[in-house]
Swiss-Prot record:
Record's protein name: Recombination protein RecR
Described purpose of this protein according to its UniProt entry: May play a role in DNA repair. It seems to be involved in an RecBC-independent recombinational process of DNA repair. It may act with RecF and RecO.
Gene3D superfamilies according to UniProt: 3.40.1360.10, 6.10.250.240, RecR Domain 1
Lineage of source species: Bacteria, Pseudomonadati, Pseudomonadota, Alphaproteobacteria, Rickettsiales
GO molecular function: DNA binding; zinc ion binding
Domain Toprim: 78-173
Organism: Neorickettsia sennetsu (strain ATCC VR-367 / Miyayama) (Ehrlichia sennetsu)
Length: 196
């Protein structure tokens, strides 16, 4: 195999969710369809590199900063949803369940991975809350050890502020069967049950 092709496969393997076989298939597909797919792929990647940037307010990725969400006058500017990653923001937007603004942390606290409060956008979040513009913070971190640790850290950091804090509910997903749920999910669902 040509060294340049090998190098491209190795590079593709670094992308999330791609192993050696998937990387090989993608590279081979791009090279086989160079006139239709490869050229368009290269042009699009170049355009993204030149035009896409992080929103100075929330951390979203768009061609303008502030992003369209932060610029929108139709959204609640005083309700901010805190998420770990941009993909979480995109998922919430796709669901259409939040009409406020966002704050992307760029990860979750993890001693194992060396992710500390200083490497996340927590200080920037503190400044947003301290400005008085935020009345409610919806902490929408993942239901993982790291996500919950991050959520608790944010609560501690914001103690004493006037901002209302809330967490997303956790528990049994819609459409799931009890037999397929793990003990942790069932435990959370029972602990957070509500009266009807």
């Amino acid at each position: 195999m040509d060294k340049k092709i090998k190098a491209l496969i190795k590079l593709a393997e670094n992308l999330p969710g791609l192993g050696p076989k998937s990387a090989r298939r993608i590279v081979l597909h791009l090279l086989k369809s160079r006139e239709t797919t490869l050229i368009r792929f290269i042009d699009t990647m170049q355009l993204l590199y030149e035009t896409i940037k992080h929103c100075e307010l929330c951390g979203n990725l768009e061609s303008e900063s502030p992003c369209s969400i932060c610029r929108s006058t139709k959204r609640s500017s005083d309700i901010v949803c805190v998420v770990e990653e941009i993909t979480d923001l995109w998922a919430i937007e796709k669901a259409g369940v939040h009409n406020g603004r966002y704050h992307v942390l760029n990860g979750a606290l993890s001693i194992v991975d060396g992710i500390t409060p200083e490497t996340l956008q927590i200080e920037k979040l503190k400044r947003r809350v301290s400005s008085g513009a935020v009345k409610e913070l919806i902490i929408a971190t993942n239901a993982t050890v790291e996500g919950q640790t991050t959520a608790q850290y944010i609560v501690e950091v914001l103690k004493g502020t006037q901002v209302k804090l809330s967490f997303l509910a956790h528990g049994i997903p819609v459409g799931s069967e009890m037999d397929y749920l793990d003990e942790g999910t069932l435990g959370i669902a029972f602990a957070n049950r509500r009266a009807v």
